[in-house]
């Protein structure tokens, strides 16, 4: 296993316009599942072979959140979402890369650029591969959702020893009736329940960021308190 650590310079925060951000990275070649799991439990996120976490000065708004799978019960509205997708085909497979993926990714981000003023970047095949395909090892997967043989949603996940790490999800906004973003997360919870996994690691909850504040709706959940290194065993998650 090769590991290289580095940090970015301070820059504009992508979540809060009045804040500055700084990110710590680990590049890990051939990362074992157990190391991935230990990093995720400590608040890191994986994209390709890179793991990252915020180390922002005078700000702790990015809070790592995980859903408690064993205590989670689907609400009436969530069951309606599941029922609406009774004919949606769901495939769990290794991360894929195709023209369909890039077209859907671009369509989703064009929509979010208009709806939520997201910054949009045109990804090449290589860039998508670096972010979402590389480094999947024996834990990285995608949930691919099809409606009438059309790829309408991709949900990238890691299936770890104690839970599922939710990496990134994008979907076709023309199929908004099906609530595909929510449906993909409900599928993660269903898979975790079937595999007897304890958690869904949802990444960062930021209360003042509309794109990330929704995560608080999924309860019961826990928030990671503080940051810990791999050699530190005292990891504290609180409801």
Curated annotation (Swiss-Prot):
Record-level GO cellular component terms: cytoplasm
Residue intervals passing through the bilayer: none
Main localization, broad class: cytoplasm
Entry-linked InterPro entries: Acyl_CoA_acyltransferase (IPR016181), Asp_Glu_LeuTrfase (IPR017138), N-end_Aminoacyl_Trfase (IPR030700), N-end_Aminoacyl_Trfase_C (IPR007472), N-end_Aminoacyl_Trfase_N (IPR007471)
GO annotation, biological process: ubiquitin-dependent protein catabolic process via the N-end rule pathway
Keyword terms: Acyltransferase, Cytoplasm, Transferase
Domain of life where this protein originates: Bacteria
EC number, UniProt record: 2.3.2.29
Catalyses which reaction(s): N-terminal L-glutamyl-[protein] + L-leucyl-tRNA(Leu) = N-terminal L-leucyl-L-glutamyl-[protein] + tRNA(Leu) + H(+); N-terminal L-aspartyl-[protein] + L-leucyl-tRNA(Leu) = N-terminal L-leucyl-L-aspartyl-[protein] + tRNA(Leu) + H(+)
GO molecular function, one term: leucyl-tRNA--protein transferase activity
Ranges in a coiled coil: none
Localization per record: Cytoplasm
Presence of the UniProt keyword Ribosomal protein in the record: no
Protein family according to the UniProt entry: Belongs to the R-transferase family. Bpt subfamily.
PANTHER family, alphabetized: ARGININE-TRNA-PROTEIN TRANSFERASE 1, ARGINYL-TRNA--PROTEIN TRANSFERASE 1
Entry function: Functions in the N-end rule pathway of protein degradation where it conjugates Leu from its aminoacyl-tRNA to the N-termini of proteins containing an N-terminal aspartate or glutamate.
The protein's name: Aspartate/glutamate leucyltransferase
Organism in which the protein naturally occurs: Campylobacter jejuni subsp. doylei (strain ATCC BAA-1458 / RM4099 / 269.97)
